[in-house]
């Protein structure tokens, strides 16, 4: 057992959830875990009671000269604050998960000579990790290839995959049974944790124009924004499509395991969960994501044979209906994609990332004894 670890993450779910998964793995091994983030992580503090959460000052760069000057000042103060914290906590190593709130802690760890690593969830290196990559000892990636890494980073880089929550791991590689003639077809429609307007504007009308025999087979789970629920529900009801709509499903892993096909965004966590459970998907990347990273995530998934990609500007009800009719009528293609999705999954990501952290910590101990 190694005494303690520090995790630095931006204050949004995309950065915090992988950190939580690693924390759970390390806590299970008897270590203490400290999370260093900004005030946005307050809601996260209660998710795993054993994680000690510390707020570090940070601000996002960008905007005008005045904002940039303020942000640089906050980052400098946050780095000094993180240095004091890390000296007191004395972690075996420090792992960063991206997001601007991770920068002060990671710079502080580097300046103190602590063992460091970063984990990049997306198929494109994020801006914070792009700054930190040349400075840390190891780089872990969620995808087989990550744009933005330098050739010189290769020897320090390993693919661990993206850690997923325990509820997803419990359903890893659930057997896929393609829809058969006359049986129901389970569709799961997700637009990220807050839903997405395009999913409600384009997908229900597309399903409504499917042939009657196909519409009658559909069993739809649709996560939509609260303001979009009435309109989508009216379309489903008018066209006699069995659909359950909610603004947030608490049982997404179970619904995903039941699904014959998912229609969703291409965030790193979504793609990881699709792959670990092994479900085919039509991915519609959010076109305004930083560095267009969702498009890169979706392309990696599709290139593995696990699904299909439709750019948001090309998502029109009439053409999408024909697309779905052909796809849902091809059980062999769905089964093959489900198999390849499972092959693409990395259910041991949290364990492999924990092993990397432990090796870094043990290496530091060995160097300390030698000195």
State the predicted function of each range.
Residues 2, 346-371:
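C-terminal alpha-helical cap of glycosyltransferases
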Residues 3-73:
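Glycosyltransferase specificity loop/lid
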Residues 23, 27-28, 34-36, 40-51, ...:
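Donor-nucleotide binding loops and adjacent catalytic segments primarily
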Residues 32, 40, 110-173:
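Active-site-proximal region of nucleotide-activated glycan assembly enzymes
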Residues 40-44, 93-112:
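An aromatic- and histidine-rich active-site surface loop
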Residues 64-93:
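An amphipathic, basic-hydrophobic alpha-helix
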Residues 91-93, 257-272, 279-280:
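Acidic donor-binding loop of glycosyltransferase active sites
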Residues 333-347:
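A short, well-ordered alpha-helix in the C-terminal region of glycosyltransferases
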């Amino acid at each position: 057992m190694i005494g303690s670890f520090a995790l630095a993450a931006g204050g949004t779910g995309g950065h915090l959830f992988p950190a939580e998964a690693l924390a759970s793995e390390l806590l299970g091994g008897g270590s203490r875990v400290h999370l260093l983030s900004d005030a946005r992580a307050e809601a996260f503090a209660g998710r795993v009671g054993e994680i000690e959460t510390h707020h570090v000052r940070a601000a996002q760069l960008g905007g005008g000269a005045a904002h940039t000057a303020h942000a640089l000042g906050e980052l400098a103060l946050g780095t000094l604050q993180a240095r004091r914290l890390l000296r007191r906590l004395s972690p075996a190593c420090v792992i960063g998960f991206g997001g601007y709130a991770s920068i002060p802690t990671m710079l502080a760890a580097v300046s103190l000579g602590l063992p460091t690593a970063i984990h990049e969830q997306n198929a494109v290196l994020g801006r914070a990790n792009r700054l930190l990559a040349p400075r840390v000892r190891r780089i872990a990636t969620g995808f087989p290839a990550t744009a933005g890494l330098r050739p010189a980073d290769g020897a320090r880089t390993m693919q661990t995959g993206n850690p997923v929550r325990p509820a997803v791991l419990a359903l890893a590689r659930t057997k896929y049974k393609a829809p058969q003639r006359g049986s129901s077809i389970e569709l799961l429609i997700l637009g990220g944790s807050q839903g997405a307007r395009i999913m409600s504007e384009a997908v229900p009308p597309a399903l409504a124009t499917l042939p009657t025999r196909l519409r009658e087979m559909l069993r739809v789970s649709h996560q939509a924004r609260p303001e979009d629920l009435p309109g989508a529900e009216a379309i489903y009801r008018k066209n006699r499509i069995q659909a359950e709509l909610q603004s947030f499903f608490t049982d997404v892993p179970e619904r995903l395991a039941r699904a014959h096909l998912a229609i969703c965004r291409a965030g790193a966590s979504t793609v990881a969960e699709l792959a670990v459970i092994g479900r085919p998907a039509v991915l519609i990347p959010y076109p305004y994501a930083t560095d267009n990273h969702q498009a890169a995530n979706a392309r990696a998934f599709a290139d593995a044979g696990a699904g299909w990609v439709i750019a948001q500007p090309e998502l029109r009800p009439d053409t999408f209906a024909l697309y779905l009719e052909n796809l849902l009528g091809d059980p062999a293609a769905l089964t093959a994609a489900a198999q390849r999705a499972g092959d693409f999954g990395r259910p041991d990501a949290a364990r492999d990332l924990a092993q990397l952290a432990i090796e870094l910590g043990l290496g530091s101990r060995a160097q300390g004894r030698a000195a």
